[in-house]
Amino acid sequence: MKTRLTSIALAALLLAGCAVGPAAKAPDVPVPTAWSLGSGDAAPDWAGLLDPQLAALQARALEANRDIARAALSWKQAQLLAEQSALRWAPSASLSANASRPIETQSSTRNVEVGGVTIPVTTSTGWSRSYGASVGVGYELDLWDRLAQSTAAQRANAEATRTDIDAARLSIRSQVAEAYWTLAAIRAQKPLAETQLALTRETLELTRSRVREGKLLPIEVDKIAVNLQAAESRLADLAADAQLQRQILALLLDEPLPGPSPEAALPAGEPPRWRLAEPAEVLARRPDVQKARFGVDASLARLRVSEADRYPRLSFSAGLSTGGSHARDWLSQPLASLGTNLIVPMIDWQRLALQRDGARTELDAAALTLRDTLQRALADIETQRIEAERVAQQLAANEGRLREATENERLAALRYEVGAVARADWLQTRSAVLDAEQGRIRLRLQQWVRQAALFKSLGGA
């Protein structure tokens, strides 16, 4: 028996040394070497974008947000699965014990006379006890790296789940900043909108008076009425937007509605022009790209497992058992066993081939997902930079409009003082200045929101 077991083990080891194991490789995905637009001098960092109040709100959101908590729980579950898979490397042990109490088979015979006839009667009485215990150890030799690749697949899945935490953190920080800056812009626009509404109402009354005097056509009243309706709608929109942004902050901070109302203010000055690293380095920091890469790693590991399933498996086992009806029998009747199990797939090749083809298809799909994720990530970064340039150009145009409107208002005020123009005409030039100032605030909001979106698209830098 020992000779047979040894021969089987040697045969398996020879197979391990001579056969060619699975050698699946990960697909290559090209990445551009340069950006289409030039970059600035400052390193990407949130520190230049935050005031203390916004930083505190972001910290509270990162601590209390439910999306991050759910992602953390999913990661913990994936880690537990990976740890369970790693246990397959360790030897497995078993322990069993049993006890029985059957009726004894000892019997006695006696004669009974019935009607002068002697009849033998046999009876069995009493109980007996029997106890037993056994212990065993088993271990599978990882000839073709099958167990290691199975564990690697679970670990890659766990790492892919971890990236959801990073993605959630980036998203939460960006959303908090956007809501905070939107509230700041609303706060800055509100007094301007209220002043513009008051000026428009006064202009409407003056225009009606001039129409009654025959100095203007009635159509001028309709034009000012349209402006008044627009001013009222703008002020109502600001109030509604403020409530919506407070609700967004409440959800992000896991607080009851209507949410906080911070004394927010837009950052002073222009957003910095960030210096970007090489595309490959930037993309490697993005959570979505990391998740796609871990998906490829997991699929590749599963393909290697399916390849290894086509090769023999070798496992060893050892056991020790004993038992008896008395304690002295436990030491006098032990039974030891050693075993070697060699599984060679010879008639299941079709199923194994289909399993391997399915794993290869999964790897191809994961590679396509990675390629698509890389392309979308590049497009996202370039889009944010293009939009930032567009907003900068719009802001420069707005500066020219504001200068022109301010100069027109100054000249109109001088002409009104000397009686060259009516008060309604001067009020309209003043309203144009207020409109340009509100447009400037909205563009500055877009500028900083785009900066936060760029930071998010860079993977946190």
Segments the model singles out, each with a brief description of its role:
Residues 212-240:
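Repeat-solenoid scaffold signature
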Residues 20-25, 52, 72, 88-167, ...:
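Small/polar-residue-enriched beta-strand and adjacent coil segments characteristic
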Residues 12-35:
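Bacterial Sec signal peptide processing site at the extreme N-terminus
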Residues 31, 37-38, 215-217, 236-283, ...:
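Short, solvent-exposed, mixed-charge loop/turn linkers that connect secondary-structure elements
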Residues 36-64:
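Regulatory alphaC helix of protein kinase catalytic domains
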Residues 63-66, 379:
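Surface-exposed, polar/charged faces of alpha-helical domains
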Residues 70-85, 168, 172-209, 224-227, ...:
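Amphipathic alpha-helical coiled-coil segments
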Residues 1-8:
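Bacterial N-terminal signal peptides that target proteins for export
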